[in-house]
Curated annotation (Swiss-Prot):
ATP binds at K632. It comes from Dechloromonas aromatica (strain RCB). GO terms for biological process: leucyl-tRNA aminoacylation. A motif ('HIGH' region) lies at residues 42-52. This is Leucine--tRNA ligase. The lineage of its organism: Bacteria, Pseudomonadati, Pseudomonadota, Betaproteobacteria, Rhodocyclales. The keyword Transferase does not apply.
């Protein structure tokens, strides 16, 4: 064994050994419990960032630990390879998206391998290959035939200069990110998946996910948004047979309706605008706004009257219809009743446009109702009683809703209804780099699914990206085709699927990526029954990706592709962000030049707090910004490859796992990286020093050990239990590492020169190599092979605590006098309460601080302390 720790050589040798032996290859084995550990697959953007490294290190630690625990482990990897960034990169670099993507995959794969992750690379796939996306095209046609995929008009952001549809994030201050043109809202035909048919199941099954963070479950519940309310109609004043429908969760306030607002796209708005140029212009202005809910929530609320009136279903009074820019056509009926007195948004709108405000709820003990200023109690439904509501006066919320719903039902104008905030999933994207939608448009036969024998519809890869619309729509060789039904000339669909489609089932494909004849097979039942055992990814995916994946497993179950596997992810760990300090200089025009922390010298005070910073190249000051998530935009990232090249993968892994619990933010620290490297060098040197005296058999009992050595062995076996619990149940890797560091400190302090001590040293170092192997597998592999020639740490069992080693002849108890720590005593581990009390009262320190006073009471906390009250 060489005396110096050389990570590059050690890690190269370990990785070659794992490749040669197929250490990470997973094969179904009914004799073992399975453990499917999956970290969310990456988008191949070019290089790994520290967020990737943290995510995949967590997964690797859990995978390696469970393999050592006797599980049959699967840890796969693939590439979420479709998406807009590839088109943007193609535009900037003048290369086709496919070439850019495949090149990035090759580089990032090598980076992942250099980190020593135990990934079964035989299962690797990229979602942009026809071998993968052919199956989602196949599934699309099945769902289309069953009505679970359908076509309807959808609202999109339209760039009138580039003649293309923009994603919400491509609209900046109402303008196209590339052209700068004012964006319009347009309705175009799009394909939707009927996720609303599964809303109730998606909601109720959240209660069967105890292994998920409560925050994520709550976010999904809110997104699905189950509301119990009343759907009712306002008959049109000039044509009572025509009705305007609305849904409300506050039917108790129906007597306070003073106007109704409809979306700009609502048929009533269109009808009213036909002879009203001013209203038509306002509707067009509304259509130029964003289509995202977040945009609508924050923008200024505007409206205009339509001149149309409807009849209140209970009072018979005329109610004016307005167009409101805050009403979504895609939610409910595209219309809302407005009760300004008891809804803050309606109140502000009514004040702005001088509309009536009618109070219909009062709360005892509150201030008087004011038509000029909003008060929180106006919206209180728990304590309120109806007023100014005719026969409903005096009723509370529930009684009022029941009575009002019954009266509406009697008039055939409404009833109670459960409604969901969740909307059907629009999967059409007017972009190039995605999975082609397998539909052919025929003038005679309509929309025809592509037959199985013509799948996959292959996406052309050698294209030129201009940024103005999808190239597919300009490629007759792609879209010109024959109708599969009648054989006549037809046109292929040029929209592609939302990239969430690919990531909604990829975890199932890992079970059988080599199957060329079916989307999935029976191996899915082995690996995925009861859910993926551990799923790891950022909380930013809490809603869409995780919700769509849950939806897909239910869809695929119902079309007979898979059995009832239950929820797809049994346990979810949402890792925290990797953050680092930021530095910048102010430029002309208020812009900031962000400077990488590696290029800055920081001055700190005696407490280590930064007081100033200068740029290394010119020595001039830079501004210290906040600590923020590592990002390209703030230039505060650390290149994982540079870290690996300087310190090795094990140091990177050790620091990342030690710096914070996995679900908390990790603050980058160069000093912390240095500390991790020093620890590994120390561990190497400690093992080297032990082996210089020759190999010995590891101790298996306390026979022949001194008292101090027995204490060390006890600590060793206590550490085994703690680390196993930290890895498995608690998933607190930082405390596991801290426990091993404490153990090594105790090892260094113990005299281990005699024969029994040498055997204990052997047992300790073998165990430490295995305890740390899931986190630092390269050095763990190398040290264990030196300590146990011919043995392979990757095939070793995780160290298990020996109950006999944990037994103590004597225990130490702290002694307090009047609640203050004053000393310590050692007593037999079997000592009874009377013996412990007597020993404590005889302790010199206790006697001194009792100051001659008698003991009024002696409190014994077993195994911990004795408190004497004097």
């Amino acid at each position: 064994m060489q005396d110096k720790y050389t990570p590059a050589d050690i890690e190269r040798a370990a990785q070659q050994h794992w490749d040669k032996t197929g250490a990470a290859r997973a094969v179904e084995d009914a004799t073992k419990p399975k453990y499917y550990c999956l970290s969310m697959f990456p988008y191949p953007s070019g290089k790994l960032h520290m967020g990737h490294v943290r995510n995949y290190t967590i997964g690797d630690v859990l995978s390696r630990f469970h393999k050592m625990q006797g599980y049959n482990v699967l840890q796969p990897m693939g590439w979420d390879a479709f998406g807009m960034p590839a088109e943007n990169a193609a535009l900037q670099n003048n290369v086709p998206p496919a070439g850019w993507t495949y090149s990035n995959i090759d580089y990032m794969r090598q980076q992942l391998k250099s980190l020593g992750f135990a990934i079964d690379w035989e299962r690797e796939f990229a979602t942009c290959t026809p071998e993968y996306y052919r199956w989602e095209q196949w599934l699309f046609t099945r769902l289309y035939e069953k009505g679970l995929v359908y076509k309807k008009l959808g609202t999109v952001n339209w760039d009138p200069v580039d003649h293309t549809v923009l994603a919400n994030e491509q609209v900046i201050d109402g303008r196209g990110w590339r052209s700068g043109a004012l964006i319009e809202k347009r309705e175009i035909p799009m394909y939707y998946m009927k996720i609303t048919a599964y809303a109730e199941e998606l909601l109720s099954e959240l209660d069967n996910l105890p292994g998920w963070p409560e925050q994520v479950r709550l976010m999904q519940k809110n997104w699905i948004g189950k509301s119990t309310g009343v759907r009712f109609a306002f008959p049109l004043a000039d044509n009572p047979d025509e009705k305007l429908w609305v849904f409300t969760t506050r039917a108790d306030t129906i007597m306070g309706v003073t106007f109704v607002a409809v979306a700009a796209e609502h048929p009533l708005a269109t009808k009213a605008a036909a002879n009203n140029p001013e209203l038509a212009a306002f509707i067009e202005e509304c259509k130029k706004g964003g289509v995202a809910e977040a945009d609508i929530a924050t923008m200024e609320k505007k409206g205009m009257p339509t001149g149309i009136y409807v009849t209140h279903p209970l009072t018979g009074q005329q109610v004016e219809v307005w167009v409101g820019n805050y009403v979504l056509m895609s939610y409910g009926d595209g219309a809302v009743m407005a009760v300004p007195a008891h809804d803050e948004r309606d109140f502000a709108f009514a004040l702005k446009y001088n509309l009536p405000i009618k109070q219909v709820v009062a709360v005892d003990g509150e201030t008087a109702f004011s038509h000029e200023a909003w008060a929180e109690w106006y919206a209180d439904k728990a304590k309120g009683k109806l007023v100014n509501s005719g026969k409903y006066d005096g009723l509370g919320y529930e009684a009022a809703v029941d009575a009002i719903a019954a009266d509406l039902a009697a008039k055939n104008l409404g009833d109670k209804k459960v409604q969901f905030r969740l909307r059907d999933w629009g999967i059409s994207r007017q972009r190039y780099w995605g999975c082609p939608i397998p539909i052919i448009h025929c003038k005679t036969c309509g929309d025809v699914p592509v037959p199985d024998d013509q799948l996959p519809v292959v996406l052309p890869e050698n294209v030129e990206i201009t940024g103005a619309g999808s190239p597919l729509a300009k490629m007759p060789e792609f879209y010109e085709c024959q109708c599969p039904k009648c054989g006549g000339d037809a046109r292929r669909e040029t929209d592609t699927m939302d990239t969430f489609f690919e990531s909604s089932w990829y975890f199932l494909r890992y079970a059988c990526p080599d199957n060329t004849t079916a989307m999935v097979d029976e191996r899915v039942a082995y690996w995925c029954k009861g859910g993926i055992d551990q799923y790891i990814g950022g909380i930013e995916h809490a809603i869409l990706h995780l919700l769509y994946s849950r939806f897909f497993t239910k869809l695929m179950r119902d079309v007979g592709l898979i059995g009832d596997l239950g929820e797809p992810f049994a346990n979810l760990l949402t890792q925290g962000m990797v953050v680092a300090p930021t530095f910048y200089r102010e430029l002309d025009g208020g812009k900031k030049q962000w400077i990488n922390p590696a290029d800055v010298d920081v001055v700190t005070d005696e407490r280590g707090r930064p007081t100033g910073a200068t740029l290394k190249t010119d020595g001039l000051p830079v501004v210290i910004g906040g600590t923020e998530k590592m990002s390209k935009s703030k230039n505060n990232g650390v290149d994982p490859q540079a870290l690996i090249d300087q310190y090795g993968a094990d140091t990177a892994r050790l620091f990342i796992m030690f710096a914070s619990p996995p679900d908390q933010s990790l603050e980058w620290s160069d000093a912390g990286v240095e500390g991790a490297y020093r620890f590994l060098r120390r561990l190497w040197k400690t093992t080297y020093d032990h082996l210089q005296a020759g190999l010995v058999a590891a101790s298996t009992s306390n026979d022949g050990l001194s008292s101090a050595q027995a204490d060390l062995r006890r600590k060793l076996h206590q550490t085994m239990g703690k680390v196993a619990d930290d890895y498995g149940r608690r998933k607190q890797f930082n405390t596991a590492i801290a426990a091993v560091m404490e153990l090594l400190n105790a090892y260094d302090k113990c005299d281990l020169k005699d024969a029994a001590g040498r055997a204990l040293a052997q047992e300790s170092l073998e165990s430490i190599a295995l305890l740390l192997f899931p986190i630092v597998p390269h050095i763990g592999q190398a040290l264990y092979a030196q300590l146990r020639p011919g043995a392979d740490a990757g095939n070793a069992a995780f160290p298990k605590a020996d109950p006999a080693a944990l037994k103590q002849d004597e225990i130490e108890l702290m002694v307090q006098v009047n609640g203050k720590l004053r000393g310590a005593i050692r007593v037999s581990a079997e000592a009874d309460k009377a013996t412990i009390e007597a020993t404590a009262l005889a302790n010199e320190d206790a006697i001194k601080f009792m100051e001659g006073k008698p003991a009024k009471k002696v409190i014994v906390v077993p195994g911990r302390l004795v408190n004497i009250v004097a």
